[in-house]
Amino acid sequence: MANSANTNTVPKLYRSVIEDVINDVRDIFLDDGVDEQVLMELKTLWENKLMQSRAVDGFHSEEQQLLLQVQQQHQPQQQQHHHHHHHQQAQPQQTVPQQAQTQQVLIPASQQATAPQVIVPDSKLIQHMNASNMSAAATAATLALPAGVTPVQQILTNSGQLLQVVRAANGAQYIFQPQQSVVLQQQVIPQMQPGGVQAPVIQQVLAPLPGGISPQTGVIIQPQQILFTGNKTQVIPTTVAAPTPAQAQITATGQQQPQAQPAQTQAPLVLQVDGTGDTSSEEDEDEEEDYDDDEEEDKEKDGAEDGQVEEEPLNSEDDVSDEEGQELFDTENVVVCQYDKIHRSKNKWKFHLKDGIMNLNGRDYIFSKAIGDAEW
């Protein structure tokens, strides 16, 4: 009894420490602008590290306890060949790291139905699964595959390589056979006319994959040029390379677009290239900068070839020559001083001057204060 009580107390102690630490740092994380999901991932990682160290027996997270319960419920069904356990993925095309003895792969939708992609682990080793980087939703979503789903599937990796997954006869591992890869490329406009604005046009690409799997839908960004002439806007499509027989390019409205079309008159478009819908890339920006530099060089060459006449610098007429300076001071009765205050009443002025020198009738006078009147 004492040993059993000790076994139940130690996991609770560790869990209480983890909960206290997470609750204490939650406010600090929120003040620093860190999302709470990061805190939950930290908690999950901490629990997984503790379970991997085997320092505490019976320490299981809620997700793993749910996995064990589901496995026990579906144990009679696992003995039949037409039932399999799988995990629904939380993010598209993301594999889950696990221990060496667990075979787990990412499998797309079946041939008969457009079901979401799933992660299929080995049913015999599901209790040893390492869910270090799995979220709570992905770990808890443990369902049974419907009848009719064969164990032979195909997957599409992040790098574009198509792999075929074949379950071995012993049911303990999967064999990957590389197939043809499908790569969706982005077509970039080679050059653009002066005064044009580049507008992205989205097209759907239906690429049938080998093995009879339903076509995978991708997106190709086809840039176009928009020329603004007055109140009209002309759209000039760029030439697109001929597709392969395994691909068919279809526009978003369902009409087939030829490789080259004449300029069409359309209503003015308002383009948005910022935010989540931004389709501009670094390559497009680099090409636009190179084009602007080339245009400036062409203008400089044209100006040098046409006139080759040196233009007068800006504000050249504002420069004061020495002759103008001499004419300005060739006057009599000059006063150079500081003014203390000035009063004005209609056309009468009264000056209070100080610390100055004045030239009157060819003689210089120095004064500290002076008062004068004038009318004009």
UniProtKB/Swiss-Prot annotation:
Chain segments carrying region Disordered: 69-107, 247-266, 274-329
Superkingdom of this protein's organism: Eukaryota
Localization (cell): Nucleus
Broad class of the protein's primary localization: nucleus
Compositionally biased tracts (Low complexity): 69-79, 89-105
Result after altering residue 277 to A: Does not affect cleavage
Keywords from the UniProt entry: Acetylation, Nucleus, Phosphoprotein, Transcription, Transcription regulation
Family the entry assigns: Belongs to the TFIIA subunit 1 family.
Protein name listed in UniProt: Transcription initiation factor IIA subunit 1
Natural source organism: Homo sapiens (Human)
